[in-house]
Amino acid sequence: MAPARLLIIDDHDFVREALEARLSEAPGLEVVGCTGCWRTGLRDAVKLKPDVVLLETKRADGQGLEALRRLAEQCPHTNVVVLTSYPDEEEQTQAHRIGAQSYILKDIDTPQLVREIQAAVRPQAMI
């Protein structure tokens, strides 16, 4: 089976770089892009067609849910996993309504994060 193609969108430089390093080493995953700007991430998602986008919605620009909406509209075959440091029940509900596959906290360990990403890919395999 081909590795799951992953795009990371997170405006926290240190966190984004750490995620890229952690997930680049994970078997079964290929990090195809990594950016802090959601607009750049959206363009990358349209161009690269990742299986999964890992998206931080609690952004300094306040545009996290807008980024999710745009991804859902423009990349309907890409699943989005929201990964955040700041859990928010209302945002979680909105994220799922918009189309997020899952909503998880950044303190998750790497093996569990990889499982969440792989679980987000599975529905596509059935199409």
Task: Label the model's feature ranges.
Residues 2-15, 19-23:
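Conserved acidic segment of CheY-like receiver
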Residues 65-77:
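Short amphipathic alpha-helix used as the core "switch/output" element in two-component signaling
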Residues 86-87:
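Short, conserved "switch-loop" micro-motifs in signal-transduction and mechanochemical regulators
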Residues 38, 54-68:
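Conserved phosphotransfer microenvironments
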Residues 36-52:
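Acidic, metal-coordinating helix/loop segments flanking the phosphotransfer/catalytic sites
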Residues 90, 108-118, 125:
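C-terminal output helix
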